[in-house]
Amino acid sequence: MSLEIVPFVVAIPARFSASRLPGKPLRLLGGRPLIHRVAERALSAGAREVWVATDDVRIAEAVASLDGVHVAMTANTHLSGSDRLAECARIAGWDPEMCVVNLQGDEPFAPAAGIRAVAALLHHSNADMATLATTIDKSEDLFNPNIVKLVCNAHGEALYFSRAPIPWNRDTFATTPEPTPLGPWLRHIGLYACNAGFLQRFTTMQPGTLEQIESLEQLRVLEAGHRIAVRITPEHFPPGIDTPEDLARAEKALEDV
């Protein structure tokens, strides 16, 4: 599959009241707000436009100092980041066919090539949404509920996403305390692409039981019968920042560069 550059915009959902790391977008990483570093990754990927969608004036004010980054002030009632981005798309006035890359606000090390790749994957697939995955090679990642796992069908489309270790190896996991994950285990990367029109359709879908149990908004798409294309990327995506421990790890990684 050719993954040449296709036109796309990037939208970054950002909320202040993250339960595991309150004020996350404004937490400092290397002396700068986390949201700054994420937005700059989007700019480096060559997006036509970069928007931060937030309901918090503190985040909006922090982003205002970044050249080339727009802010969409959204409602504080959205159930998910994708719901927030649907409002952002209306504010920005994007064409329904415009490819929108949803870059999570906790991905300060997202490689530019990976951002471009997910846009190209959507362009070349017949799926409603596209995302990326990478292989898991550490047992602590496989069993970490903050690291989302996924399984795919033979056509490279997502079957399910879970915080649990899927697929479950019945013969190994039940008997080995810390098995080495040699096999088909994949870590989901919090990066999505869909067109602006599908974002609006997303808002009409009711959150299903699976989404509510796992607290994973992408399951709403699968539960509604839509398809998500998945590419196993060679690009290195460090895990996102969800907890104070993740932030400390990212700080150390930045110091080691």
UniProtKB/Swiss-Prot annotation:
<keyword id="KW-0548">Nucleotidyltransferase</keyword>
<dbReference type="GO" id="GO:0009103">
    <property type="term" value="P:lipopolysaccharide biosynthetic process"/>
</dbReference>
<comment type="pathway">
    <text>Bacterial outer membrane biogenesis; lipopolysaccharide biosynthesis.</text>
</comment>
<comment type="pathway">
    <text>Nucleotide-sugar biosynthesis; CMP-3-deoxy-D-manno-octulosonate biosynthesis; CMP-3-deoxy-D-manno-octulosonate from 3-deoxy-D-manno-octulosonate and CTP: step 1/1.</text>
</comment>
<dbReference type="InterPro" id="IPR004528">
    <property type="entry name" value="KdsB"/>
</dbReference>
<comment type="similarity">
    <text>Belongs to the KdsB family.</text>
</comment>
<protein>
    <recommendedName>
        <fullName>3-deoxy-manno-octulosonate cytidylyltransferase</fullName>
        <ecNumber>2.7.7.38</ecNumber>
    </recommendedName>
</protein>
<dbReference type="GO" id="GO:0005829">
    <property type="term" value="C:cytosol"/>
</dbReference>
<comment type="function">
    <text>Activates KDO (a required 8-carbon sugar) for incorporation into bacterial lipopolysaccharide in Gram-negative bacteria.</text>
</comment>
<dbReference type="InterPro" id="IPR029044">
    <property type="entry name" value="Nucleotide-diphossugar_trans"/>
</dbReference>
<keyword id="KW-0808">Transferase</keyword>
<dbReference type="GO" id="GO:0033468">
    <property type="term" value="P:CMP-keto-3-deoxy-D-manno-octulosonic acid biosynthetic process"/>
</dbReference>
<dbReference type="Pfam" id="PF02348">
    <property type="entry name" value="CTP_transf_3"/>
</dbReference>
<keyword id="KW-0448">Lipopolysaccharide biosynthesis</keyword>
<dbReference type="InterPro" id="IPR003329">
    <property type="entry name" value="Cytidylyl_trans"/>
</dbReference>
<keyword id="KW-0963">Cytoplasm</keyword>
<dbReference type="GO" id="GO:0008690">
    <property type="term" value="F:3-deoxy-manno-octulosonate cytidylyltransferase activity"/>
</dbReference>
